[in-house]
């Protein structure tokens, strides 16, 4: 890449970054937080944060990258995607009418809400316990990270339930919403994330998500400022780099350490070059249509329920890894959101996907606002826990693609909804047995005086 070519790419990158950052800033000034702000920051991180890192790798370490015209296509496709997404998100689908009382879909009380977070936490802890009994601490047993996807590890499906510890702790926080509950959320979820990091053998997702939710709650409540958020972001990048070194068993120093930091940080936070690789091999892609969305559900079907279930699932990540990169190491490589759309239907699917994503984020913001307006604090805690708990799925959307997002968000809704229904059923059983006694003002006053 020549300096002239880099200059052209830099101008396009700068314009796209300023365009998205400006719209995000205006939205932040207006509402302080919603899921459009979160997705916009996530989109910036995924598709634009990596460009400076790639540039340093090219000019400082002479690392090979895709041709400049392909990198240009990747930047422009990301910028155009966001423009279509933003217009879709801002388009009002129906006329705004005055709020009229409606019969709520469901209600929550104190006991049901506490039962819900206890069940969610129980799902996570029991899953971790069973996985640990089968495998022990994989971080200290396995020689390479890719081995966690091999047949040596049993009970892999249980890992999908670990994440429900975070929604459980979110319910606890939203019931109190003070600084002590906020700090308790951070300590409990990060401690759990470190535990799963050691047990699973290097998976950092629970730590990243817990820390991100903690920061956004702090921004919403005004407990942290933007410069503190930036400082925490830098600390998070360094922390993730250190965990990556431990995961891969690397011991580096000097120029090698700087080089390793650049490419690991790029691959962890901003795999935008994967989109460029897909575009470079565009003519060789056999478009998969909507089949990857259906196939991605296969991993959630137990083999005892479907004995003939395919052992290798050809979703967009695996198609990119196996067919485009010819990589059969056992580790799927993220195609990114736009890359998954390219695999499914080529360039035509990029604007269509942007419209779909705009509607998805609009729905989450509608649910979030519903929680903000809800007078029942127990129901509001459940709604907010569901919305913030789905942040993991939005990260999957940006990094892994639309097919992975759909299967995971459906799984999240089913498990979260099942825990909610079990809590309501248990409350009904306890109430029928006479074990539930409603609090009265006189009893509360007696407790306070005592």
Curated annotation (Swiss-Prot):
Do the record's keywords include Transferase?
Answer: no
Q: Where are the transmembrane segments?
A: 6-26, 37-57, 63-83, 118-138, 155-175, 181-201, 207-227, 228-248, 341-361, 378-398, 410-430
Q: Offer one example of a GO biological process linked to this entry.
A: enterobacterial common antigen biosynthetic process
State the Pfam families in the record.
WzyE
Q: GO cellular component terms?
A: plasma membrane
UniProt entry keywords in alphabetical sequence: Cell inner membrane, Cell membrane, Membrane, Transmembrane, Transmembrane helix
Membrane topology designation = Multi-pass membrane protein
Pathway assigned to this chain's UniProt record: Bacterial outer membrane biogenesis; enterobacterial common antigen biosynthesis
Cite the InterPro entries for this sequence. WzyE
Subcellular locations according to the entry? Cell inner membrane
Superkingdom of the source?
Bacteria
Quote the NCBIfam families the UniProt record gives.
PRK02975.1
The record describes the protein's role as: Probably involved in the polymerization of enterobacterial common antigen (ECA) trisaccharide repeat units.
UniProt family annotation: Belongs to the WzyE family.
Q: What is this protein called?
A: Probable ECA polymerase
Its lineage opens with:
Bacteria, Pseudomonadati, Pseudomonadota, Gammaproteobacteria, Enterobacterales
Gene name of the record? wzyE
């Amino acid at each position: 890449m020549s300096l002239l070519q880099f200059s052209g790419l830099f101008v396009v990158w700068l314009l796209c970054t300023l365009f998205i950052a400006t719209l995000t800033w205006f939205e932040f000034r207006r509402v302080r937080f919603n899921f459009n702000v979160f997705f916009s920051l996530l989109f910036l991180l995924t598709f634009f944060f990596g460009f400076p890192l790639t540039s340093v790798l090219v000019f400082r370490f002479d690392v090979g990258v895709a041709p400049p015209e392909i990198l240009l296509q990747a930047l422009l496709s990301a910028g155009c995607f966001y423009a279509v997404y933003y217009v879709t998100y801002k388009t009002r689908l129906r006329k705004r009418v005055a709020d009229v009382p409606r019969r709520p879909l469901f209600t929550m009380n104190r006991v049901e809400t506490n039962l819900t977070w206890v069940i969610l936490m129980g799902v996570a802890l029991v899953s971790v316990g069973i996985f640990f009994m089968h495998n022990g601490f994989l971080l200290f047993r396995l020689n390479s990270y890719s081995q966690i996807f091999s047949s040596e590890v049993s009970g892999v499906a249980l890992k999908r339930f670990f994440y429900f510890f975070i929604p459980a702790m979110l319910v606890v926080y939203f019931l109190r919403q003070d600084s002590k509950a906020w700090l308790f959320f951070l300590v409990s979820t990060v401690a759990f994330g470190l535990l799963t990091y050691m047990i699973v053998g290097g998976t950092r997702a629970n730590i990243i998500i817990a820390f991100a939710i903690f920061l956004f709650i702090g921004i919403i409540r005004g407990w942290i400022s933007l410069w503190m958020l930036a400082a925490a972001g830098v600390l998070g990048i360094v922390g993730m780099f250190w965990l990556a070194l431990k995961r891969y068993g690397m011991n580096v120093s000097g120029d090698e350490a700087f080089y390793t930091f650049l490419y690991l940080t790029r691959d962890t936070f901003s795999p935008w070059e994967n989109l460029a690789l897909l575009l470079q091999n565009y003519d060789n892609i056999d478009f998969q249509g909507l089949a990857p969305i259906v196939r991605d559900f296969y991993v959630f079907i137990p083999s005892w329920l479907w004995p003939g279930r395919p052992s290798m699932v050809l979703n967009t990540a695996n198609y990119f890894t196996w067919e485009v990169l010819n990589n059969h190491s056992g580790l799927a490589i993220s195609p990114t959101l736009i890359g998954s759309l390219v695999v499914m239907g080529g360039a035509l699917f990029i604007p269509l996907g942007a419209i779909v994503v705009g509607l998805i984020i609009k729905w989450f913001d509608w649910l979030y606002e519903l929680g903000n307006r809800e007078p029942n604090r127990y129901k509001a805690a459940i709604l907010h826990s569901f919305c913030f708990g789905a942040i993991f799925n939005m990260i999957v959307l940006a990094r892994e693609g639309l097919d992975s997002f759909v299967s995971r968000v459906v799984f999240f809704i089913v498990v979260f909804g099942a825990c909610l229904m079990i809590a309501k059923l248990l409350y009904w059983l306890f109430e029928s047995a006479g074990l539930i006694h409603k609090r009265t003002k006189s009893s509360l006053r007696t407790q306070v005086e005592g």
